[in-house]
Design a protein with these regions (language model features):
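Short acidic-hydrophobic, aromatic-tinged amphipathic segments that line or gate anion-handling sites
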Residues: 131-132, 192-199
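Metal-dependent phosphoesterase signature
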Residues: 54-90, 94
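Active-site neighborhood of HAD-like aspartate-dependent phosphohydrolases
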Residues: 1-41
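Helix-loop "lid/cap" segments that line or gate small-molecule binding pockets
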Residues: 27-28, 47-61, 117, 146
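Conserved Lys-Pro-Asp/Glu-containing loop-to-beta segment of HAD-superfamily phosphomonoesterases
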Residues: 2-4, 139-165
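Substrate-recognition element of Asp-dependent hydrolases with the DxDx(T/V) motif
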Residues: 24, 92-119, 133
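Acidic, Mg2+-coordinating phosphoryl-transfer loop and its flanking beta/alpha structural elements
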Residues: 157-195
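Conserved H-loop
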Residues: 34, 123-128
């Protein structure tokens, strides 16, 4: 029986705040825009379009492309020294693979960014499939297409935001909500809520 554990990235696998807040502040300062770190923190895990709406309201295509270029450059520069997984994630991924689970990603980002981040934090090779914004306009849509591609008998999503919960519900699979992530108040209705990565293993055993 083919079983998949499907992971969100930001706030689930990756300690994104370690580099993203500074990168965004640099890009905003370049545009003479001042926002609090809390505003940027709330953007972590959102789709690129949702981040633009939250920070700017709207941008024309040229301004958007320049913005994305700046963010990518600032993030990559800072990531080289700071990027890392949450403690225990590598051990969890290794153990899930040992137990015979297949691993996949479901993300609000685009493939190039996903590969860059997962490679930088040293876990890219654990995942056999990547679900990205190329597959849909929302996390629920991405997960639908990903599940169709995986054609698995059982699956569980692991994430830390309300759109992870929504995606799991729309697609009728259980969610492990990461209380250690960036929006613990958003995932209290998950099937299992955990407080540290190592608890993912017990949650998976219980749910699938």
């Amino acid at each position: 029986m083919k079983k998949y554990v499907i992971f969100d990235i930001d706030g689930t696998l990756n300690q994104t705040a370690l580099y993203a807040i500074e990168a965004y502040q640099k890009a905003l300062k370049k545009r003479n825009i001042t926002v609090s770190d809390d505003v940027i923190f709330a953007c972590i895990g959102l789709s690129p379009a949702a981040i633009i709406t939250k920070l700017f309201g709207s941008l024309d295509d040229n301004a958007y492309q320049v913005w994305r270029k700046d963010i990518q450059e600032y993030e990559f520069s800072i990531m080289k020294d700071r990027a890392k997984t949450f403690d225990g994630i590598v051990e969890v991924l290794c153990e899930l693979k040992r137990r015979g689970y297949q691993l996949a990603i479901c993300s609000n980002a685009y493939p190039k960014h996903i590969k860059q981040v997962l490679t930088m934090i040293g876990i890219y090779n654990y995942f056999s499939e990547i679900g990205s914004l190329k597959m849909g306009n929302s996390k629920a849509e991405v997960l639908t297409k990903l599940l169709e591609k995986l054609n698995c008998q059982k699956a569980c999503l692991v994430g830390d935001r309300k759109f992870d919960l929504e995606a799991a519900r729309v697609n009728h699979i259980p969610l492990i909500g990461c209380g250690y992530g960036y929006a613990p108040n958003e995932i209290q209705e998950a099937d299992v809520v955990i407080n540290k990565p190592l608890e993912i293993l017990e949650g998976i055993d219980y749910l699938i």
